[in-house]
Amino acid sequence: MSEFVLQDSRGNTGDRLMFWAKDGAGYTTNLENAQRYTKEQACSQNESRESDLPWPLAYLEALAEWSVDCQYVEPEEVSRELLDATRAHLYASNAWNGNDLVFLTGDGGLTNDLRKAEPFLVTIAVAMAANPVNKVSVIPHLLAVRLARRVIPNGKVKHREALRGTGVILAKPPKYRAPRDRCDHCGVFISDAQRFQDCPKCKGSNAP
């Protein structure tokens, strides 16, 4: 049976999609913690609120990135694990994608995906982080791996492509219809602009 997750499309954290979390725990960017739904359950929720978008779980899993939430990086734990580490990653000290660390790659670029981050020799990483000019911090490789979780960048996924062949039909948001005014004198419908002019039919004034 295909599993689905529900995105709250009203907003992202950085460029990470937000999903309904398991056990009613609000929202999460962590794909592991996203509530699983059957196709029928996902469609039913989308019909109730069109901003809740169903995604096939398998589609997202194939495109997920592994990222580290800065909120779970404890300085004491970093210092302790650096003592025995052989490899470490460097990340920008004052830049985040939502809450996620921005790592350095081997060619001097930046990435949010831990799999693309350069695993520097720990002595080199520590020396670079110690120089304030570099504006980078260090995290041991094994600690980063333990903290990493799968997230979905909105630029890597396409909703129409994901739903192709699933049979899912999205609810259509209700069309907005502007309220129509009537002439205070003869009752004929008038446009918003005509509320401040004489009625085109009876010539009565509708000015406030």
Regions found by a protein language model. Give the residues of each.
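Residues immediately within or flanking Cys/His clusters that coordinate Zn2+
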Residues: 176-183, 195-196
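Short aromatic-glycine-(Arg/Gly/Cys) micro-motifs in beta-strand/loop hairpins
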Residues: 3-29, 87-113
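A short, charged, amphipathic alpha-helix used as a generic interaction element across diverse proteins
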Residues: 26-53, 106-142
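Short, mixed-charge low-complexity intrinsically disordered segments
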Residues: 45-74, 126-175
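SH3-family beta-barrel domains
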Residues: 1-8, 158-162
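Disulfide-bonded cysteine-rich modules in secreted/extracellular proteins
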Residues: 85-92, 180-186
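Cysteine-rich micro-motifs
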Residues: 193-207
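Short Cys/His-rich metal-coordination motifs, predominantly Zn2+-binding knuckles/fingers
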Residues: 183-189, 202-205
